[in-house]
Amino acid sequence: MVKSLHCLIGIVLFLAILNAGNGFTLDRSASIERQEDSWPKISLFHGNQRKNDLKKSVSPTWNKLSRCPVYLPTKSDTIRVVQIKGYFAEKKQTIITSYCIIK
């Protein structure tokens, strides 16, 4: 019984570490299109206006927790989603609160 409990706790901790990932927090509204390689693609919206012209910041700021540079993703950037706040089915929109740009 005790060994089973320790094993279960170990598995849960292992999965939690796998899911944690590296990311920085930046609140943005985004829609996700699933790619074949399972990395999500992000398209940023501001109201009804699609933000095609987002540029990466010239001098990135650094998040103290994750050590990830804070860039604004462009339409063509591929990102790894780390944390999702909620999904709105009627708008097919997801609020992503943490992500990393994949280079």
From Swiss-Prot:
Residues 1-23 form the signal peptide. Keywords: Disulfide bond, Secreted, Signal, Toxin. Expressed by the venom gland. Contains 1 disulfide bond. One of its GO terms (molecular function) is toxin activity. GO terms for cellular component: extracellular region. It is found in: Secreted. Belongs to the scoloptoxin-24 family. This is U-scoloptoxin(24)-Er1a.
